Amino acid sequence: MIKRCGFITRRGDLSHDAFVAYRTSRHAALGAAMPGLRRYVVNFIDRRRFPDCAYDGFSELWFDSEADLQAALASSAGQAMLADVPNFIDVLTATVIEERVIVAG
């Protein structure tokens, strides 16, 4: 299993609350429609505790393989999800993560 993480900085004209609302409704529905997606998690930075963090949040998308990830992004659902990014994101840095569990709970 592989995990793609996207580190996100919201558009400057959106409040944090508006960013969270859009991210968890419209954009999440687009992402969830991608074929082969095994797990999808969105995370938001607590701005009260970390007001100077460079990111507003990050996403985690799990796939069985790199080929499944690439197929999902190339699909019509993946293309719709990517096309939606400028509606709420200024900067998106995406990477594939190798996860090593130290403590399983």
PLM features per residue range, with description:
Residues 1-105:
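Macromolecular interaction modules
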